[in-house]
Amino acid sequence: MLFTFTDEIKVIFVKDTMEEIINGLLIVLVPMVLGYLVKIQNQNALAFINKIVMLLLYVILFMMGFMLGQLEHLEQKLPIIVMTALGLSAIILTCNILGLAIYDRTLPKPVNYLQGELPSRWHSLMDSIKLLSAVIIGIVLGWLCNDWLHFPHGSNLYVLIALIFFVGIQLRNNGISLKEVLLNKQGLIMGAIFTLSSLIGGVISAFFLSMPITQGLAFSSGFGWYSLSSVVLTNAWGPMQGSIAFFNDLSREILSLFLIPLFMQHYRSTAIGITGATALDCTLPIIQKSGGIEVTPIAISFGMVTNLLPPLLLVFFSSFPI
């Protein structure tokens, strides 16, 4: 059989794609592993690291907004970004709820009643609004400074590397036994159901929103980790796609604040699962207060799955051109 020019092009494409995937995984996973190796016992140092993580998060979101503000014909593209993100969020979240609710009905679990006072959902909502404000400020300044100020290409990636390194330090020093988390069967099953239902939602979204399937799968792979998905997709496809990913994943966090108490009493897996990657951080206090202390290992096990998979899935799906 002759080796045609078309075959050669396919080989080159596959090789370049694999190199992009490997490089992307190294960029994301290496700093997390290095951070996880750092053991810190000083509580003041840990508190300082927590502040650094929040600062870097605001910087990343501001930079993403700044680059979005410098898009040509922004006034025409912004409504498309918001409407696309809302469509993605509605479809993917619906698939998550259906999949996890079926699991809840098949394997019902006892649930503790509400323990203590719920953390203020309005306080958590204000935190989300602050993050959104960083993007909006970036958009305005990017639009105003478009003629004379531009960030170097890929500069937001270096900020992301620093952020992931410090997140790795946080994971290493969270005080939860790794054995307790890894051996939690329910959390792992929930993670698998959540991942599968999210990807199904991505395919359905691609069909209804008239986008390539790989793009729909990429948008569904953020799992609520907006600081990661927005940067990865911005660098892969541009600030417009990165902004869609941001609004899609941020909406999961905001909606979770209200849906967790609503589902926890009768649909515990659903209540935990809709949070996605945020189960390890901002929504964990609400999960614990709504479902009792025994749901904490489940949430952390689930959160580990939904924090480990997004880098792999995002890098893989975003390596395909659109």
Predicted regions: what they are:
Residues 20-32, 75-98, 127, 131, ...:
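Entry/N-cap segments of selected transmembrane alpha helices
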Residues 2-18, 42-49, 100-136, 281:
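Intrinsically disordered, low-complexity non-transmembrane regions of multi-pass membrane transporters
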Residues 309-322:
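Juxtamembrane boundary at the C-terminal end of a transmembrane helix
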Residues 42-53, 69-85, 107-125, 148-154, ...:
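Interfacial helix-loop-helix linkers and transmembrane-helix boundary segments
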Residues 19-32, 53-54, 84-95, 152-166, ...:
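Structural signature of hydrophobic alpha-helical transmembrane segments
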Residues 32-38, 84-114, 189-233, 251-264:
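Transmembrane alpha-helices that form the ion-translocation and gating core
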Residues 30-38, 53-77, 137-142, 157-180, ...:
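Hydrophobic transmembrane alpha-helices of secondary-active transporters
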Residues 65, 70, 215-255, 263-301:
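Alpha-helical membrane segments and immediately flanking helix-loop junctions
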